[in-house]
Amino acid sequence: MINVSTGTAAVFGLDNIKMDVAPTTGYLMLGGRCVMDCAFCAQARSSQASALKLSRITWPEFDESQTLAVLAKAVERGDIRRCCLQVTVAEGYFQRTLEVIRAVRGTCNVPVDAAILPRDMAQVEELLAAGVDHIGFGLDAAGERVFQRVKGGNWAQSVSLIEDAARRFPGHVAVHLIVGLGEKEQEVAEVIQRMHDLGLIIGLFAFTPVRGTRMEDVSPPPISTYRRMQVARYLIANDLARVGNFTFSTAGQLLSFDLPPLPEILADGVAFQTSGCPDCNRPFYNERPGGMMYNYPKPLTSQQTKAAIEEFEVLI
C-alpha cells in the first residue's frame, strides 16, 4: 500500500473529487508516523492528528501496483509531469524510498523527486544513484533560534549537509522554508540568499496550523508578510537583487526592496505562484479552496497579480 494525496488520487482516477486546480506533480507519501517531532507537522511523533494528514492535505492509501499503473497512464496523458515522494523518518524509511524510486522509474519515464531527510552524504549519493532528480531538504526554519524551538536537532549539522550536497550535486538539491514559524522577515531573506548562492532550489511554504499538532493554535502568517517573502525569493532566485539591497526595520521587517521598476518586474505574477522544483504546483497545500491564496497553483490573472502586489505593503 502507498499513500497518495487526494488531488493526485483524483488525477489518477483513484478518487472522484471536484478540483479547482489539478496537481501537475504526483505526490506520494511514504513512512508513517515520524520519529522526528516538528511542532507544526501532522506526522510528528507527538502529533494527535490523523495518520492520513500532511499539512492540510489528506493522503488515502491505495494498492501500490495499481497506483504505479495509473501514474504511468497519467504521465502518458501529460497530466502528471513529475513525481514527488514525501518521506517521513519512520523505521526502514530509507530503503523503502529507494524501492519506490526504482519502481516508479521502472514503470514510467517521469522525473522523481524526494522530500526526505538523508542521514549523511552517502545516503544523498544513494538517492541520486537510484534515479532521484531532486532531493528536497525540509530545513523549514529560517535560523537556529526557530529551528531549535519548532524542530529540535542540530541546526549546524543540518545546514552543513544541505550545503555540502548542493556543492557536490549542483542542480539536484532543493530546500523547503516555512514562513510563519516565529522568525523575522530578515532571517527568511538572508537564508534565501545563502541557499541561492549555493545553487539550491528554494520552495517557499506558508505555515498552516493543523489540528492535533503542537502549533494547532498558532495563526498562519499575515498575507503581507508572505507576499514580501515571495517577492524576496523571486528577486534573489532570479539574480535581480540581493538581500543587501533590501531595507529592514530594527525589528527585522522588510520595508523596501529598493528596486525602482518593481511593479514591472512583478507584472507577470510569477513571483506569487508556487515555488520549488519544476512542475510542483501543490494546489491548496497551504490554503482552503476559496480562501486566502498564499501560493497560486497556476498563472495569475492580471487582477490577481494587481491584488498580490497591493498585499505586500512595502515602498516600491
Regions found by a protein language model. Give the residues of each.
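N-terminal [4Fe-4S]-dependent radical SAM core
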Residues: 1-61, 70-73, 271, 283
